[in-house]
Amino acid sequence: LIRLQKACSSGIDLAIGSRYCQGGRIENWPFSRWLLSYFANLYVRLVLWIGIKDSTAGFKCYTRKALSSINLDGNNFKGYAFQICMKYAVIKNGLSFTEVPIVFKDRELGVSKMSSGIFKEALLGVWKMRKMNL
């Protein structure tokens, strides 16, 4: 988190802790989960035409300027779609971003929040985002 904050302090509007940029990686995930995550991020890049490699990342740091630029009332998504929409809004508003490599380790306790509803919302939601006033 410190590296994300340092990136924002240096003038970047959004710093993303990325599993998929150079130097980032995932530990202890089954191949099927990695494959789903990787192709979901590729899908988002293609539909929204953004350069973020890890659009579903949960580790991020926004500047006040970035958050102030986003129409938060327009983002009614949950789960991964919410994460994607926030990042997309920053880019759509012409602000800067960077991806900072992280090592993502699979949880040792608890269960994933992924559900078919969250997956469907993200899959269809990116098409809605293209038309939204963010």
PLM regions with names:
Residues G94-I118, M132-L134:
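Unusually extended, aromatic-enriched hydrophobic runs near protein termini
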Residues C8, C21, I91-G94, V126:
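Generic helix-packing signal
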Residues I84:
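DNA-recognition element of transcription regulators
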Residues I70, Y88-V90, S96, S112, ...:
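Amphipathic alpha-helical interaction segments
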